[in-house]
């Protein structure tokens, strides 16, 4: 874990209220794993004082495959992310990371069934890196991407560039299935019945609950990444606590 003052190296707007910030920091990049996040300051002043948690979107590598930087895929949801959207190349922010518990991904010596990535909204951010790592290890991957509208869909092109089959759902029916992303997932499981499938999910709480119910019903392993506001990023302040079967965690 490192605490660094970093210059923003790139800014790309990818949709309404959606943007990507790029940073160079070999120390953080070399330790990033799929599912890690960083805590990033949003203003030079103390208002707002708390940093915001952002999932690692992609790890940047040079010609020799050495990690040298990382990107964050961000959606404006409040004053903090709105301030980040106003940042320009060359602006500086404080970044603490990598933080969190990464996804537990199988290696090449344990090739399993199909890995199904289920995501909604900005919960899509960690999954291109998940897919990339699984594909490197020879695993089969399929993505289910949901959003309110076609404009709000994230990471679909990332998956297609990786050769990952993608099923899309939008609340308003403007692209793909008209409805919630769990319905294409359920339909796929019912029609294909993939043996030894593994589920991964990140997105709105109702979506996560629905994926959990599917996993429980079908006795499929499930890993989740929670979207939660937090103050410290390391579990000390307890603001990110969620209730699990074994108690709060």
Show the residue positions of the predicted features:
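Short, charged beta-turn/beta-strand-edge "cap" motif at the junction between a beta-strand
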Residues: 43-47, 97-102, 246
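Ferredoxin-reductase
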Residues: 2-89
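FNR/FR-type flavoprotein reductase catalytic core
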Residues: 79-229
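Local cysteine-cluster metal-coordination motifs and their immediate loop/turn environment
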Residues: 126, 205-206, 227-249
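Active-site donor-binding loop signature of nucleotide-sugar glycosyltransferases
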Residues: 25, 171, 242
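Alpha-helix termini
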Residues: 62-64, 189-195, 245-247
